[in-house]
Amino acid sequence: MFHVLKSTYLQPPEVVNQTRPAHLEWLKDEVGAGRIVLAGRLEDESGAVLITGDMDAEQAQDIVDRDPYTAAGVARYERLSFNGAFRAAGL
């Protein structure tokens, strides 16, 4: 399964930004390992969307749990899982 992880910020930007450097390092590690294949902030900057590689729900939850934003309580995630039956080459 693939998973869309939609985060919503729970704190004002100045509080979220205190944890942002650690979050970005975590994100680089997840992308580098292929666990996250696409990520970015929402246009209105109220949160972000991350798309995982092919993995089970427990692995996707582990990604969320390792995010410094989760540990700091500045964001929460909603997970939408899908089978990814149609995909571009390389995914």
Show where each model-derived region lies.
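Conserved, structured core segments of small domains
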Residues: 1-91
